[in-house]
């Protein structure tokens, strides 16, 4: 399930159901996209566990489904990134739809593992030719930024200037994919789609 924050609303991200507020988020991401949260679990029919970059990796936060700030959609899709195999698999209802060869984070700035969600779909050219055609930003962050890195701490699936990146550990933590695969993902994958990154 995907929970979208309604325009004009704010949403409290809590440490647990009825717990303390860790952050408040609006209906737009820092990149200007509609905020769509991938729902990982539910509790007591009222509380939804979600991931958000505002609280860091591998930390679920809880949102009140009865707050009136959310609307819901569903997607049968899931992206599975296998860091060892250096592949990204698009799954629909558990069946493989497409298998991509990717580049991943190098030693010292590895791609973080865990369950995340697609938060933004952006034009790569608006940022740098190094990002290729397209950027799918994730709710994951990079805690091990390389010295001198100025590109922010968000993890994304994006392009590269070098086709030799695919099948290798070469990035500052992001997942590198070909422009043709990125265009497919941009067309196919809705905001809030779950992304599982594993070793």
Kindly give the residue locations of the regions a language model identified:
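Boundary regions of SH3-family modules and the immediately adjacent low-complexity/disordered segments
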Residues: 1, 51-81, 98
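Beta-loop motif signature
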Residues: 1-38
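Extracytoplasmic
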Residues: 6-10, 34, 45-47, 58, ...
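Residue-level detector of high-confidence beta-strand sites
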Residues: 24, 99-101
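SH3/SH3-like beta-barrel superfamily modules
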Residues: 27-67
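Exported/periplasmic cell-wall-interacting domains
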Residues: 54-55, 67-77, 106-117, 122-199
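Gly/Thr-rich phosphate-binding beta-strand-loop-beta motif of the actin/hexokinase/Hsp70
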Residues: 88
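Short acidic-glycine loop/turn motifs at beta-strand connectors
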Residues: 91-95
């Amino acid at each position: 399930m995907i929970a979208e924050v309604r325009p004009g609303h704010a949403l409290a991200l809590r440490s647990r159901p009825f717990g303390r507020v860790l952050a408040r988020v609006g209906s737009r991401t820092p990149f200007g996209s509609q905020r769509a949260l991938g729902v990982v679990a539910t509790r007591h029919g009222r509380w939804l566990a979600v991931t958000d970059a505002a609280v860091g990796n591998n930390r679920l936060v809880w949102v009140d489904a009865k707050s009136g700030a959310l609307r819901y959609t569903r997607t049968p899709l899931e992206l599975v990134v296998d860091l060892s195999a250096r592949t990204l698999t698009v799954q629909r209802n558990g069946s493989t739809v497409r298998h991509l060869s990717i580049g991943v984070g190098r030693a010292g700035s590895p791609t973080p593992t865990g369950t995340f969600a697609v938060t933004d779909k952006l034009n790569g050219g608006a940022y740098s030719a190094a990002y290729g055609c397209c950027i799918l930003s994730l709710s994951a962050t990079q805690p091990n930024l390389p010295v001198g890195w100025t590109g922010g701490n968000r993890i994304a699936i994006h392009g590269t200037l070098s086709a030799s990146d695919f099948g290798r550990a070469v990035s500052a933590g992001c997942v590198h994919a070909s422009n043709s695969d990125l265009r497919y993902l941009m067309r196919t994958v809705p905001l809030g789609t779950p992304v599982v990154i594993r070793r």
